[in-house]
Amino acid sequence: MALEFTLNHVAPAAAVDCLVVGAYADHTLTPAAQALDAASGGRLTSLAQRGDLSGKTGATTLLHDLPGVSAPRVLVVGLGDAARFGVPQYLKAVGDAVRALKAGATRSALFTLSEVAIKDRDAAWAIRQAVIAADHAAYRYTATLGKKKTDDAGLAQLAIAGDDALALAQGQAIAAGVEFARELGNLPPNYCTPAYLAEVGVKFAGEHDGAEAEILDEHQMEALGMGSLLAVARGSANRPRLVVLKWTGGGDAKPYVLVGKGITFDTGGVNLKTQGGIEEMKYDMCGGANVIGTFVAAVKAKLPLNLVVVVPAVENAIDGNAYRPSDVITSMSGKTIEVGNTDAEGRLILCDALTYAQRFEPAALVDVATLTGACMVALGHQTAGLMSKHDDLANELLAAGEHVFDRAWRLPLWDEYQPMLDSTFADVYNIGGRWAGAITAGCFLSRFTEGQRWAHLDIAGVASDEGKRGMATGRPVGLLSQWLLDQAARA
């Protein structure tokens, strides 16, 4: 169940089930905690001195019926070392608080940590990110669970200390986009097919003024010459779709265009994946899910810009008609591609989608894809990989990610890597060999974005958590939404 958010800043007298305040490792209290301490005759200070209240990072202490405090509960969240308290510590504190309260009987709470000073961040940022982080922590997947396992208990309403209504609304919009993306990513592949992704896009656009959807089927894609995308789709009974979503909030200005890889399940094709990886391949559409989530955020925030989202939705499966290693296919651009590996399919659907996207004459073109395991090996789960030949665009995206702690790290896209994609039988080979796999994948895409202000985000390491119980993260909806907020502010 999604949280309801409001603004409030009368801490000691707030009419809520619980007040959320903070304490540092040295027992220093946040301003709201100091007010409660004074109202209760020094109760918080006494508990801290006795060791019954911890300010260590990750610690939460739930107190009941403090004298002089109207709320029946006070949750004290440990903030760690005061000198090191910054963006990641703040976001962790939000999550710690929400998880602690979701497990109990508290239905409403006031979160006061948004009033704590954070270096290089303002009050609007604190409110906006508190909403996003709280909603992320409260998320529970229930779509395919039995009725008895649905989650409607615990915290339902969270007031954020502050008075910036715009920041609250933006936070709610971005949180909705993140949740939308996570829900799509978490759905099993027999639910989330290419046709389902198309239906979801049409439904959302139909419910919001200024948004529209266009869906291309395989016959329309064939007429456009999308031979690369259609080659990947040949082996599946779930036929492909090209999902195109448009938001018109910026008059006649050129749109920002996001392209997201939408492989709804990736068997690897003839180059079949093995156990130990294939069971997580429902997440191979998270690039598509996350650009749709960013679209949701932009529409709900009513951003004053134009946005186009393009998602090639395809299942990479195997039957007698599946494409093979050594096939030569013709892309929409006219370039021919020799298939070296059918498990390097993401770039084959993206190249046609990127070519199609250029008809919108984008102000900037950004693709998002769970493209390579090589990027995950290089960067782990902490950051996405970013590639671009346009320093200004790369710097905008890097700054947006750093601002909201949804970070990316730039990798080179030098011409010296391009010969690794040479083919004897076609214009380009779809793999680059053993080395620099993330970079050569970016180089492949660069051949289909010439003349465009373009960047590539490889999100293989950040799109989902590891393991059997891992879930879609919604990254980088935060980065992309902040980037669009920045563009709207400059307009």
Curated annotation (Swiss-Prot):
Q: What is its main location?
A: cytoplasm
Among InterPro entries, the record links this protein to: Leucine_aapep/pepB, Macro_dom-like, Peptidase_M17_C, Peptidase_M17_leu_NH2_pept, Peptidase_M17_N
Query: Under which main EC class is this enzyme filed?
Result: hydrolase
Which reaction(s) are listed as its catalytic activity? Release of an N-terminal amino acid, Xaa-|-Yaa-, in which Xaa is preferably Leu, but may be other amino acids including Pro although not Arg or Lys, and Yaa may be Pro. Amino acid amides and methyl esters are also readily hydrolyzed, but rates on arylamides are exceedingly low; Release of an N-terminal amino acid, preferentially leucine, but not glutamic or aspartic acids
EC number, UniProt record: 3.4.11.1, 3.4.11.10
According to its UniProt record, where is this protein located?
A: Cytoplasm
| GO biological process assignments | proteolysis
Cofactor(s) this protein requires = Mn(2+)
Q: Which residues does the annotation say bind Mn(2+) 1?
A: 266, 343, 345
Keyword line:
Aminopeptidase, Cytoplasm, Hydrolase, Manganese, Metal-binding, Protease
What does the cofactor section's free text say about binding? Binds 2 manganese ions per subunit.
**Residue positions binding Mn(2+) 2:** 261, 266, 284, 345
User: What CDD domains does this protein's entry cite?
Assistant: Peptidase_M17 (cd00433)
* Alphabetical list of Pfam families matching this protein: Peptidase_M17, Peptidase_M17_N
Q: Which PROSITE patterns match?
A: CYTOSOL_AP
Its cellular-component GO annotations read: cytoplasm
GO terms of molecular function = manganese ion binding; metalloaminopeptidase activity
Q: What does this protein do?
A: Presumably involved in the processing and regular turnover of intracellular proteins. Catalyzes the removal of unsubstituted N-terminal amino acids from various peptides.
- Family stated for the protein in its record: Belongs to the peptidase M17 family.
Under which name does UniProt file this protein?
A: Probable cytosol aminopeptidase
